[in-house]
Amino acid sequence: MDGPGASAVVVRVGIPDLQQTKCLRLDPTAPVWAAKQRVLCALNHSLQDALNYGLFQPPSRGRAGKFLDEERLLQDYPPNLDTPLPYLEFRYKRRVYAQNLIDDKQFAKLHTKANLKKFMDYVQLHSTDKVARLLDKGLDPNFHDPDSGECPLSLAAQLDNATDLLKVLRNGGAHLDFRTRDGLTAVHCATRQRNAGALTTLLDLGASPDYKDSRGLTPLYHSALGGGDALCCELLLHDHAQLGTTDENGWQEIHQACRFGHVQHLEHLLFYGANMGAQNASGNTALHICALYNQESCARVLLFRGANKDVRNYNSQTAFQVAIIAGNFELAEVIKTHKDSDVVPFRETPSYAKRRRLAGPSGLASPRPLQRSASDINLKGDQPAASPGPTLRSLPHQLLLQRLQEEKDRDRDGELENDISGPSAGRGGHNKISPSGPGGSGPAPGPGPASPAPPAPPPRGPKRKLYSAVPGRKFIAVKAHSPQGEGEIPLHRGEAVKVLSIGEGGFWEGTVKGRTGWFPADCVEEVQMRQYDTRHETREDRTKRLFRHYTVGSYDSLTSHSDYVIDDKVAILQKRDHEGFGFVLRGAKAETPIEEFTPTPAFPALQYLESVDVEGVAWRAGLRTGDFLIEVNGVNVVKVGHKQVVGLIRQGGNRLVMKVVSVTRKPEEDGARRRAPPPPKRAPSTTLTLRSKSMTAELEELASIRRRKGEKLDEILAVAAEPTLRPDIADADSRAATVKQRPTSRRITPAEISSLFERQGLPGPEKLPGSLRKGIPRTKSVGEDEKLASLLEGRFPRSTSMQDTVREGRGIPPPPQTAPPPPPAPYYFDSGPPPTFSPPPPPGRAYDTVRSSFKPGLEARLGAGAAGLYDPSTPLGPLPYPERQKRARSMIILQDSAPEVGDVPRPAPAATPPERPKRRPRPSGPDSPYANLGAFSASLFAPSKPQRRKSPLVKQLQVEDAQERAALAVGSPGPVGGSFAREPSPTHRGPRPGSLDYSSGEGLGLTFGGPSPGPVKERRLEERRRSTVFLSVGAIEGSPPSADLPSLQPSRSIDERLLGTGATTGRDLLLPSPVSALKPLVGGPSLGPSGSTFIHPLTGKPLDPSSPLALALAARERALASQTPSRSPTPVHSPDADRPGPLFVDVQTRDSERGPLASPAFSPRSPAWIPVPARREAEKPPREERKSPEDKKSMILSVLDTSLQRPAGLIVVHATSNGQEPSRLGAEEERPGTPELAPAPMQAAAVAEPMPSPRAQPPGSIPADPGPGQGSSEEEPELVFAVNLPPAQLSSSDEETREELARIGLVPPPEEFANGILLTTPPPGPGPLPTTVPSPASGKPSSELPPAPESAADSGVEEADTRSSSDPHLETTSTISTVSSMSTLSSESGELTDTHTSFADGHTFLLEKPPVPPKPKLKSPLGKGPVTFRDPLLKQSSDSELMAQQHHAASTGLASAAGPARPRYLFQRRSKLWGDPVESRGLPGPEDDKPTVISELSSRLQQLNKDTRSLGEEPVGGLGSLLDPAKKSPIAAARLFSSLGELSTISAQRSPGGPGGGASYSVRPSGRYPVARRAPSPVKPASLERVEGLGAGVGGAGRPFGLTPPTILKSSSLSIPHEPKEVRFVVRSVSARSRSPSPSPLPSPSPGSGPSAGPRRPFQQKPLQLWSKFDVGDWLESIHLGEHRDRFEDHEIEGAHLPALTKEDFVELGVTRVGHRMNIERALRQLDGS
């Protein structure tokens, strides 16, 4: 009205209430409503209840005054000609009295509140007579009920059978357009109540169907919005209701009908001319809305009626694309496959009520017909409505309406019929309808609620058809109907009805059993075919439908998925008995199918191939990394959990028929999109982990897919960049890279890495020999590179072990990471473990690790490494695969062990190297995980989680590379070193790979395999260390070789596989395998079941049976064998095994389950144990090598003793992985002290490192322990399991830990994974340690390894390669954590993860959150004999280490703090062991390491103390007691454990282990610490050493020889095997406790304990001034400000800097939010106060 057109008329409007008069130009051709709005806008005063003001035409010329009906045109009311200007009043709508019936007093008396309330009650009670009486007295019915806001007319409109009441009210002066307080008219109310009778009456009384409510919405809009019986919708449309009303968001009725799936309303709207192309404010048409909200029926109607499916919304998306984005693939397919030839426009014309005056309607009608005419070909403007309805008026737009009608027909023919019939069919006019209304007023089950109405009228005239029904819809009679009129047919419940057409009045025409006729629409209900599909369809069918888009290219036009090329194929795999299928399976873990999972083009199924061995069985069958499993042996597995799929694969035996879908991005998408197309990032995983979230949030998932694409690109780029670093890996992983999805963390460029290193004082990657390490580098790089690359990318490679574990624990594993390419970057790290530290990927990344813990790559690597290691010794070859598989845990590792083995050797000159390279491609049959599957079936199955760890599918190659590397470095055993399959998961943690690798074979080989020149070996070890992946793979794979171990062995899992080379089945297998290996060692060259001759880890050459390495391997094997029984109980942990935890984790977390993992790391042969040491060795190979002879001896002796007391060894390894650790430790020990270690696999791992023949010739101190050690050893397996559990625990703490680790460059999960293996390797590290040590093989680094080269490795390599050196622990922890998180053992594993985050270096790793769940387990194991068991071992191993550590600690000042704590725990068995360890500590190598070990021990002890404090044990006894056998402070040990244990929180894992078990748990935390320790890296030798010292002390105690301590320290120190039960127990509790808080209670006795600070974390146990930057990061995490951690660490902010930080400093550090700064300052004040 504001801008009236040429026809505008000037009208004088008086507003009596405001005593104003306005002259306004109003448009006579517009509705009165528009004029009213014009007036309201012109007012300068607000009116109360303005909506109920109306334009009143005063009486004139004998005519009574009246209010103008708002929906009629202004020109319908002739102006008063008595005045010069037309005059209208704007006044509140009151009853208009024909004459002054009553005076004011009487009026006031009538309208009292009581009377008005009484009047409303009369209306409510249908008291028509009383209502009429009051109205006759002059009561004005236009008022609001003070309570409900209703007015009498609106209330009556909601009542059934209120026709008479409505008439009385209307005649009594009620305004039809009077609105309730909510702004609704009676017509709106009747429509919303679906009261067709009342609506009909109101319309008959002259109400307009187009009254607007307070939002300007019409009754028709409300009808489409509310759904239910479509009769009201039909009545309104029939009465010329206006179409196209839009709300504030531009939604029209058609949009709302589609939004809520009101098909019949939609059909009616379309029939009456609704614009199918109408777009809302976002540009979405009704079809877009259907696509978005998955309303398939509505979409079919729209398409059938000719909707344009090519219209794009304002985001330039078609409906098809919207459907894809929303994850509604079935609907997307419907849209995609719809053809124009399928369109059937309405052939009929809509009927209209003729009673409406054309004046008002003409305006309305005209536009409507036009609308329809545009789309209707059959528009016959004049076609009268055949229906006898009140007054059907046919408009030109009837054709349009016809079209709509047809659509509606399809939808709900009956609804309209009923509605119209009532009014038009002669049913008896509106009144009749009204009765029917009540019946049909409620929402009818069927489309036509009016059906009751129709029956109401006795004489039913002939039904009139409105339009044809949409074909393809199925209806079933839900209630019986008996014919009551002409042409009607009877219906019986349950009959299938074919609807032919939609008639008037809610009647539909249909056919039932040959009978054709009319029936009420509400008698039938539509049955969604889709529902049937989902109910009866197998997942396979669903998958077929889902992927049809891919195959038919239906997604081609979808931008989001246009970059995906979906290719489905059926592969038939036939393998030999002892080989695998050659692929690693990864995916979500779930006991039951995850129905919430919605396949997307990028992530079509939950399980996918994380890696495929090149030239393996699967490869030859055409399977490739990243392929999603749709069917396995004919069973649809799109939504099936990992374990079940593994079970299906195993059930098939040697034959496997898999239907897979390859999702690849189109090459054209060169841009960022070309990343990893296949698996969505981890959306499903999230969905995996949080399955409902990711999987269900289609849009989110879509976004994640896009993100993934970006990541993919990153991976590709990374691969491109990495080749320069190591082309090998690039080649091997190039495919993986593409296939594997990388975590979304940002990529770190080499430059950034360098700067990171510089910042952290770590040697740059270039410094790391690993990267350039001869053949190994690339091999290593495959797995490690990924990690490194991920690190470089800023994304931690998925820490397969940890992350996966966590993830696996609950959730779908992330899609295959197409991040294999990233490994190249990790390769850098590989070369330098320090990078591990340096690239602290974003916490997210680190946490990605949680997700990533599911890294297939790592898993694969682990498996591969193990296999490789084992491979060197003949039997080991096959076993490795199973172990590797186990490691893969969640992922079915179907790679052949042999190939892995082959790969590992590649770097080294021995025969192994060639094989390793092979393995990298993983072509050989043995490589096939399935080959292992046979033997490890159970384990594999159970290990689904562990397997999962091998998360990077692509990484499998990397694993192989790692194996090659390991083989190279470790020689034959090297592969064992390579057993850090974890490492293979490049995504796990960039930094970790190095550690893993280093630990893996090389260090081991150097230490025990003398074949390679010491320096060369050391160098190799170092490289390997850097490329933990490689070594890890070797070690793990090597270890796992136990053929006996069924892949599915539940508890055995990877650790077990690793541990048991096949000597036994199940967990025992794992242990036995080490034992077997040991036996062969003892027996002679062929000591291990895997191979009579052990192969040098570094050189790959057969070891001289008498050589320390061979002895250590043999001892380890023996220990494993002895442990086997203990392990067998681990089946409980089978879930853990399933979870792809780190090897160590496996062993630690679940001795049996995980045991294989650890075992591989400590493979019965030297390879098995090598991993632990190897990892350490990798870091400290040089040192280790140097120490190799003597250190090894003493260490080995220690370890041997420890080995005897597997618990101790396990404990040592415990941190790493309880089961694994012992295995690793034992293996290491065995290696050094060949036969002697047989009983103590753990010890072997721990001792093997330092002592060539720990078992054979236990050192003075160690020998005493051997007995207990053995006992421990036996129990240790249980403990080991306990350790394993922690990995599962990747809870928030874990997350933090991971984050921290990532930041530090140690990614806990991978590290854990690696740790499991690395730890194993590190023990052998003493000899190789020097080699590995990035920092020169100096006594000090060694000393960091305190008792054994481990310390050295830790100190040098570990520091340089935090991942490497601390990796063993960290990795162990990670592994554990991973296992834990992934596995059912999550409770235990969780702790581990957390723990490992914080400890070393202030490192996040330590105790970020000791797995809490493990707590209980830890405790029970602690109490159990295992602890005792472990204690001897611990004491032995730990004592020797601790002694040495103590020595150093004392010198460093660590001893005092750590000493007390340690003894406390250790005091029980520890004291005994301690005595031995003291002697052990005399070992030259360990001595050098001692200071570091002590510091680490001290740090750990401090943490433990803190934890212990919670337990009530002395907080600071820590290192000193730990180191000092005399000090029998189990609590101290426990504390250490706690700190470490927290990390590994494996305490509870091995309940069977008894005290040893407790110790095992301890070890687990230790694993965490190792990571931390590793974190320090060469850059922070002091803190690292200190941490390491602590770790070494604990670890040392755990593994007698210095070699092991660092590695073991990490795992062991926490576990403090020496302190068997008590320590373990305490640790366990502490761990659990710590897990959240971290070992803050422990003060930081160790000088280098900087990292520890905070009750549960290392930092909590140190004074603020001693905090390292990692402690600061942990502390930030603890106050929930972890997002600032990266910046703080980048700026090298240490504890001493915190108090001096100013506001400007905080801003520079990224703390821009005042609240965050205040929180930090408050927390600092609290620290000061405390």
From Swiss-Prot:
The modification Phosphotyrosine is found at residues 122, 555, 930. Residues 404-415, 1016-1026, 1174-1194, 1360-1370 have a biased composition (Basic and acidic residues). SMART domains: ANK, PDZ, SAM, SH3. Residues 444-460, 812-844, 1251-1261, 1321-1333, 1638-1648 have a biased composition (Pro residues). The modification Phosphothreonine is found at residues 912, 1130, 1234. Disruption phenotype: Animals deficient for isoforms 1-7 exhibit self-injourious repetitive grooming and deficits in social interaction. They show defects at striatal synapses and cortico-striatal circuits with an increase in striatal volume, dendritic length, and surface area and a decrease of spine density, length and thickness of PSD. They seem to have an altered molecular composition of postsynaptic machinery in the striatum. In contrast, animals deficient for isoforms 1 and 2 exhibit a normal initiation of social interaction with a perturbed recognition of social novelty. GO terms for molecular function: actin binding; ionotropic glutamate receptor binding; scaffold protein binding; SH3 domain binding; structural constituent of postsynaptic density; synaptic receptor adaptor activity; zinc ion binding. It is found in: Cytoplasm; Synapse; Postsynaptic density; Cell projection, Dendritic spine. A motif (SH3-binding) lies at residues 1410-1416. Residues 354-466, 664-688, 760-1460, 1475-1524, 1546-1584, 1627-1663 are annotated as: Disordered. Residues 857-869, 1078-1092, 1235-1250, 1371-1392, 1627-1637, 1649-1658 have a biased composition (Low complexity). InterPro entries: Ankyrin_rpt (IPR002110), Ankyrin_rpt-contain_sf (IPR036770), PDZ (IPR001478), PDZ_6 (IPR041489), PDZ_sf (IPR036034), SAM (IPR001660), SAM/pointed_sf (IPR013761), SH3-like_dom_sf (IPR036028). The modification Phosphoserine is found at residues 373, 375, 387, 394, 482, 694, 781, 790, 801, 890, 897, 995, 1134, 1159, 1163, 1166, 1253, 1420, 1510, 1521, 1529, 1539, 1634, 1636, 1638. One of its GO terms (biological process) is positive regulation of dendritic spine development. GO terms for cellular component: ciliary membrane; cytoplasm; dendritic spine; excitatory synapse; glutamatergic synapse; neuron projection; neuron spine; plasma membrane. The modification Asymmetric dimethylarginine is found at residue 965. Residues 1122-1131, 1495-1505 have a biased composition (Polar residues). Residues 1494-1514 form a coiled coil. Residues 570-664 form the PDZ domain. Residues 1667-1730 form the SAM domain. Belongs to the SHANK family. In isoform 1, the N-terminal region preceding the ANK repeats interacts with the 6 ANK repeats in an intramolecular manner, thereby restricting access to ligands, such as SHARPIN and SPTAN1. May homomultimerize via its SAM domain. Interacts with BAIAP2, DBNL and SLC17A7/VGLUT1. Interacts with DLGAP1/GKAP, GRM1/MGLUR1, GRM5/MGLUR5 and LZTS3 C-termini via its PDZ domain. Interacts with ABI1, HOMER1, HOMER2, HOMER3 and CTTN/cortactin SH3 domain. Is part of a complex with DLG4/PSD-95 and DLGAP1/GKAP. Interacts (via PDZ domain) with the GRIA1 subunit of the AMPA receptor (via PDZ-binding motif). Interacts with WASF1 and CYFIP2; the interactions mediate the association of SHANK3 with the WAVE1 complex. Major scaffold postsynaptic density protein which interacts with multiple proteins and complexes to orchestrate the dendritic spine and synapse formation, maturation and maintenance. Interconnects receptors of the postsynaptic membrane including NMDA-type and metabotropic glutamate receptors via complexes with GKAP/PSD-95 and HOMER, respectively, and the actin-based cytoskeleton. Plays a role in the structural and functional organization of the dendritic spine and synaptic junction through the interaction with Arp2/3 and WAVE1 complex as well as the promotion of the F-actin clusters. This is SH3 and multiple ankyrin repeat domains protein 3.
